[in-house]
Every structure is written in structure tokens, then in C-alpha cells.
Amino acid sequence: MPKMKSVKGAVKRFKVKKNGTIKRGSAFRSHILTKMSQKRKRNLRGPKTVHSTNVAGILSTLCKA
């Protein structure tokens, strides 16, 4: 049987924490931020966690399921 290969784009975007939750970054934070309010930019700051309904799919792309 061939080796399981992880999706390289998913490896770069997600990190699995010790308690099993998955850490992700926020979208819409790269450029053209002048038209966005300070409150919206502040809420997009920092790492977020993946919702529980998406965890199984992401773990399978990372070959950790």
C-alpha cells in the first residue's frame, strides 16, 4: 500500500494543538485594509480555532485521523 500523503496547503495553514483542537489564521488580512473599520480588523487579529464540524475533514487532509 502506498504512503499516505498530506495536502501540503493544509499543512501550511493548520496546526493541531495538544488538546486536539486545530488552530487557523484569519482571512481578509492581507491587503487593502484602509476601507475596513478598526473594530473589524481587531476582531480578525490573532489565531482562531476550527469549528468542530470541520475538524474531521481537516484531520484527514493532514493524515492525522
Swiss-Prot record:
InterPro entries: Ribosomal_bL35 (IPR001706), Ribosomal_bL35-like (IPR021137), Ribosomal_bL35_CS (IPR018265), Ribosomal_bL35_sf (IPR037229)
Disulfide bonds listed in the record: none
Record keywords, A-Z: Ribonucleoprotein, Ribosomal protein
Any GO molecular function: structural constituent of ribosome
GO process terms (BP): translation
GO-annotated cellular components: cytosolic large ribosomal subunit
SUPFAM superfamilies linked: L35p-like
Origin: domain of life: Bacteria
PANTHER family: 54S RIBOSOMAL PROTEIN BL35M, LARGE RIBOSOMAL SUBUNIT PROTEIN BL35M
Family: Belongs to the bacterial ribosomal protein bL35 family.
Protein name: Large ribosomal subunit protein bL35
Lineage of source species: Bacteria, Pseudomonadati, Campylobacterota, Epsilonproteobacteria, Campylobacterales
Gene: rpmI
